[in-house]
Amino acid sequence: KNPESYNKILEHLYGKNGLKFTHFKVEMGADVNTSSGTEPATMRYEDEKADVTRGAGFQLAADIKKINPDVTLDMLWWSEPKWVSDSSDVYAARYKWYKQTLDAAYETYGLVLDYVSANQNERAVDTDWIKYLSKALKSEKDCPYDYSEIKIVAADECGTWGISRLMMKNKELCDAVDVIGSHYTSFADDTTKKLAEEYGKELWFSEGSSPMNYAQSAYRFDEGNSG
């Protein structure tokens, strides 16, 4: 309804004369409240074609890419459609949801995803699923661009880097994960630092709060450790 204001906001956040944000996360959605709203599911039924126009996220990603084509895109999820969780083969069903959503994002908006978050937001880490997703993307042939180039983020845990310890004990898992992300933490433990320094893993503070929003979990990463 207000395209000029909308574009002005996007220019301020992502434009060359603005804040120059470089990354955008888009939720796949499952028609449930995910703490800040309800994002529509891209696939409500197993036999329907994925529809990325139901919510605003993918359209927003496309508009951001018009302003700055170098912005990287990450796809993640807080919950999944019931047909996925009720499936006799949850991993295959979940991958179908991922894959068809990736396909639809490209077909509808020309979006190429740089990252996908494997784990459900702030839930128990499913290492077998992370490995399954990595193998499936790397071997996918029926795709509009090279899905093997999509990097996997794990595990969006809250206040811990537990995934790092699991990775150090499991080479296949370690190889599957490109980015280690944690929420609401002001530190990285020695194992996580080793994975970054010796194994080349990216480390992300992948969710946090600004001081004026929720000061208890907001951190200023300065030399004084002012927190």
Stretches with model-predicted labels:
Residues 1-113, 118, 127, 131:
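N-terminal catalytic cores of secreted or lumenal carbohydrate-active enzymes
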Residues 29, 121, 185:
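Flexible loop residues that form catalytic
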Residues 73, 99, 103, 108, ...:
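Substrate-binding and catalytic surfaces of secreted/luminal carbohydrate-active proteins
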Residues 78, 121, 157:
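Short, well-ordered beta-to-alpha junction loops that form the rim of enzyme active sites
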